[in-house]
From Swiss-Prot:
The gene is Sde2. Keywords: Cell cycle, Cell division, Coiled coil, Cytoplasm, DNA replication, DNA-binding, Mitosis, mRNA processing, mRNA splicing, Nucleus, Phosphoprotein, Ribosome biogenesis, RNA-binding, Ubl conjugation. Residues 306-315, 324-361 have a biased composition (Basic and acidic residues). Upon binding to PCNA, the N-terminal UBL (ubiquitin-like) propeptide is cleaved at Gly-77 by an unidentified deubiquitinating enzyme; the resulting mature SDE2 is degraded by the DCX(DTL) complex in a cell cycle- and DNA damage dependent manner. Both SDE2-UBL and the mature SDE2 are polyubiquitinated. Residues 393-427 form the SAP domain. A motif (PIP-box) lies at residues 39-52. The keyword Ubl conjugation applies. Pfam families: SDE2, SDE2_2C, Sde2_N_Ubi_vert. InterPro entries: RNA_Proc_DNA_Dmg_Regulator, SDE2-like_dom, SDE2/SF3A3_SAP, Sde2_Ubi. This is UBL fusion protein SDE2. Inhibits translesion DNA synthesis by preventing monoubiquitination of PCNA, this is necessary to counteract damage due to ultraviolet light-induced replication stress. SDE2 is cleaved following PCNA binding, and its complete degradation is necessary to allow S-phase progression following DNA damage. Plays a role in pre-mRNA splicing by facilitating excision of relatively short introns featuring weak 3'-splice sites (ss) and high GC content. May recruit CACTIN to the spliceosome.
Length: 448
C-alpha cells in the first residue's frame, strides 16, 4: 500500500493560504519553504517560519495538515539603548531630588509638593494672625507699664514761668549794657580826640623799631621832621635829663661823624664790618634796650616815654644816615684785613654774650693749615671740650657752627638748635666713632 502524500499549508506575505504537497513523508520544512519561495520569487533569507505562533527550525519534519506562516524579518538598529537605560537608572538611584519625577497620574512631584505646602500655609494663617496680635498687645502693655511724664504738674509750670522771666530780665540787662557801652564809647572818643597825635606818635614809634639799611635818600625828610619837633624835645629833655643822654650822644656823634671818619679810617672800617656781621637780633637789641632802660629808670607816664623813645630813634637814624657816606669813603680796598677784623669783632661779641665762666671757656677760632682746602673756604674748627652743653654752642651763631661742622666733614644744614646739637653730639669722639649718618655726602663731579 503506497504511503499517503503529506499536505502542508503555507501562508506567505501578500498571498492567501496555499496547500503544498510533499513528495515524501520525511521531507523537511526547509524543502517546503524553499519550493514556495521559488514559486513566489521571493528571497528565502528574508523570512522565518512559525507554526502555531512558535518558531520552527529549518530541519524539522513537516506535519500533515499543519499551517506554516512566513514572517518577514525586520531590519534592527545598532543597539545601545539598553546601556543608556542602565546609566539613567544609576543616576536615578543616586539622586535624592525626586521633584522632576512624575506620579502615576502624570503630574510632577514638584507641583504636588507645592500644593501641599500652600495648603499648610493657608491653614496656619489664622495662627500667625493671632500670634501677631498677641505680640502687639504685649508691646503696648510694656509701654503702659513705664512711668508717664506728667506735664500738668505745678512744679513744671512754675519752672517754665521762672525760666521765661529770667530770660526777659537777662535780655533787658544786655540791651541796657550795650546802650551804655555805646554812649561811653562816644564820650571817650570826644575826650580823646585832642590826644590823637600822641597815639599816632606811639604807633609810629612801634613801627620804627625795625632797623632799615639804605635810608640815605630819606635824610632830608628826616631832618625836616626832627627840626619841627625840636621844641617839644627841649621841653622833654629839661624835665627828664636821664632820658636825653642817648639822644645827645647820638647828636654829638652825628655832628662830629665826618671829622672822626676822616681822622681814623681804620676805626670806621672795623666798626662798619662789625655791624655787617651782626645778626638781625643783635641789630634790634640796641633799638629796644634804651627804651627799656628809660621805662625802668624813670617814673614818668607811658605816653611821655613813648614820645621820647620816638624822638630818640629819629636822632639815631639821622646820625646813622650821616655816617654812611663817611663809611663809604673810608672803606679800604683790601678785603683780607677787613675779613680779619670782622672775625675778631664777631668773636668778641660771642664772648660778650656769654656770662662769667662761659666767657673764659670759649676759645678763639683757630683756622686749620694753609695747605688744606677748608682753610681757603674760611672753614674753622672749634675746641668742643670747652663747651658744656649745646646751648653754649648756639651763642656762636649759624655761620660759626656751619664752619665748625664743615671742618669736621659733617652735615652743616638745619636750624641753629639742630646745628648746635649735631656739633655737641660729636664732642670728644674720634672720626671712627662718629655716626656715619652725620657725615656730609661727597660732592659728585659734573659728567662731561
Amino acid at each position: 500500500m503506497a504511503e499517503a502524500a503529506v499536505l502542508a499549508w503555507v501562508r506567505g506575505p501578500g498571498t492567501a493560504w496555499k496547500a503544498l504537497p510533499c513528495a515524501s513523508v520525511g521531507c523537511s520544512v526547509r524543502d517546503v519553504i524553499y519550493r514556495h519561495c521559488e514559486e513566489q520569487e521571493i528571497p528565502v533569507e528574508c523570512f522565518f517560519v512559525k507554526c502555531n505562533g512558535v518558531l520552527v527550525a529549518a530541519g524539522d519534519k513537516v506535519c500533515h495538515g499543519a499551517v506554516y506562516s512566513l514572517e518577514p524579518r525586520l531590519r534592527g538598529g545598532k543597539g545601545g539603548f539598553g546601556s543608556m537605560l542602565r546609566a539613567l537608572g544609576a543616576q536615578i538611584e543616586k539622586t535624592t531630588n525626586r521633584e522632576a519625577c512624575r506620579d502615576l497620574s502624570g503630574r510632577r512631584l514638584r507641583d504636588v509638593n507645592h500644593e501641599k505646602a500652600m495648603a499648610e500655609w493657608v491653614k496656619q494663617q489664622a495662627e500667625r494672625e493671632a500670634e501677631k496680635e498677641q505680640r502687639r498687645l504685649e508691646r503696648l502693655q510694656r509701654k503702659l507699664a513705664e512711668p508717664a511724664h506728667c506735664f500738668a504738674s505745678p512744679d513744671y509750670q512754675r519752672q517754665c514761668h521762672e525760666m521765661a522771666e529770667r530770660l526777659e530780665d537777662s535780655v533787658l540787662k544786655g540791651m541796657q549794657a550795650a546802650s551804655s557801652k555805646v554812649v561811653s564809647a562816644e564820650v571817650t572818643e570826644t575826650r580823646k580826640r585832642p590826644n590823637r597825635s600822641k597815639t599816632d606818635q606811639g604807633a609810629g614809634a612801634k613801627k620804627k623799631r625795625c632797623f632799615w639799611l639804605g635810608m640815605e635818600g630819606l635824610e632830608a625828610a628826616e631832618g625836616s621832621s626832627t627840626g619841627s619837633s625840636d621844641d617839644s624835645e627841649d621841653d622833654d629833655h629839661e624835665d627828664a635829663p636821664g632820658t636825653s643822654g642817648p639822644s645827645c650822644c647820638a647828636r654829638e656823634n652825628g655832628s662830629d661823624g665826618g671829622e672822626v671818619a676822616a681822622d681814623s679810617p681804620g676805626s670806621v672800617q672795623s666798626s662798619g664790618s662789625g655791624t655787617r656781621s651782626e645778626s638781625p637780633k643783635e641789630l634790634q637789641n640796641p633799638m629796644t634796650e634804651p627804651g627799656q632802660g628809660i621805662l625802668e629808670n624813670t617814673g614818668t607816664e607811658p605816653g611821655e616815654t613813648s614820645t621820647r623813645e620816638h624822638n630818640e630813634r629819629k636822632t639815631v637814624t639821622v646820625t646813622e644816615t650821616e655816617e654812611t657816606p663817611a663809611r663809604k669813603e673810608t672803606e679800604s680796598p683790601e678785603p683780607t684785613e677787613k675779613g680779619q677784623e670782622t672775625g675778631v669783632i664777631g668773636e668778641d661779641r660771642a664772648a660778650m654774650a656769654l656770662s662769667g665762666e662761659d666767657r673764659k671757656s670759649i676759645p678763639a677760632a683757630t683756622p686749620e693749615g694753609s695747605n688744606s682746602g677748608d682753610t681757603a673756604l674760611g672753614v674753622e674748627a672749634l675746641d668742643l671740650s670747652a663747651f658744656s652743653c649745646a646751648a653754649e654752642l648756639e651763642l656762636l651763631g649759624l655761620e660759626r657752627l656751619k664752619c665748625a661742622l664743615m671742618a669736621l666733614g659733617l652735615k652743616c644744614g638745619g636750624t641753629l638748635q639742630e646745628r648746635a646739637a649735631r656739633l655737641f653730639s660729636v664732642r670728644g669722639l674720634s672720626k671712627e666713632l662718629i655716626d656715619p649718618t652725620l657725615f656730609a655726602k661727597p660732592s659728585k663731579g659734573k659728567k662731561k
